[in-house]
Every structure is written in C-alpha cells, then in structure tokens.
C-alpha cells in the first residue's frame, strides 16, 4: 500500500521519527511529506534513507554528516522527512529510481539522467546532474546501466567512467544486455 515502516536503532534519526531511547523495537509508520504520500521505491544508506513518493519527488531522512540527505542544508533530519532539492532550492522531481553507495545517493530521473549528492561529491548537500551520463535505465550503488547496455561507474570527479565489458570471440565488446 506504499507505507514505509521502520524500526531498530535510531542514533542518527534514521527511522524518520523521534524515539525515547534511541531505538524502536516496534515497526512504526514513516510520514512522507505533509500529505503522507505513498512510497513507490525505497533505498537505505549508511544511517539515512530515501523514498520516492507517488509524486516522483524524493524524500530523505537520517544522518546528514556528508550531505547525503540532499536537502540543501547540513543539519540532521531530526524528526522530519524532507525532499531532495537542487541548488536553487527546487525539489527534484521525475524520479524513477534511487540508489545509495555509502554516504552518497543517486537518483535516476525519467529523462534518463542521474542526479547525485553526498560524500563522493565533496559532501554536496543538494542534487546535481551527473554530466555526460544520458539514456540511463537503472542505477545500483554507484553504477548506472544505459539503455544500450553500457555500464558506467559514477565517481568523485563527477565524470562517469565506462566499465569495460566482455568481448566476443572476434574481440568485439559486448554490452551487458548481450551477455
């Protein structure tokens, strides 16, 4: 039904709500935005979490010591859930995929581009588009799969690197979709 439930340790507010003893043994509902939006995808990072709502906005909560909440500030998300924003303060919209890699987060957008924020991008606390990365179909960790089957690694310098694939008997490089 699109409800996000969390429980466990809450030392960095990663549960998305306040707890009395820094933990919750019982699952409790996480409220996404003022309208309690339903989630379509979730991703867990290192003591922080992300969720894509039905509106295609991305919500984040938890530890923010490396800008991994992407909400434009350096504060931990104490109790609230915030939306991921661009540098100009507008919400990231059009999200169709999310992924985390340590304290860095990646958002796949409907137009085939990827937005990134967090530790591997100089602790950047807002989303920016990875330059040179287009026609992406899926993100996982800090890797991206293109529609043509190429695998790209996203790295600290904001320049994606093509990961070499397998070769056929004639030495021709095969895309991941042809393996």
Which residue ranges define each predicted feature?
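Eukaryote-biased RCC1-like beta-propeller repeat architecture
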Residues: 1-179
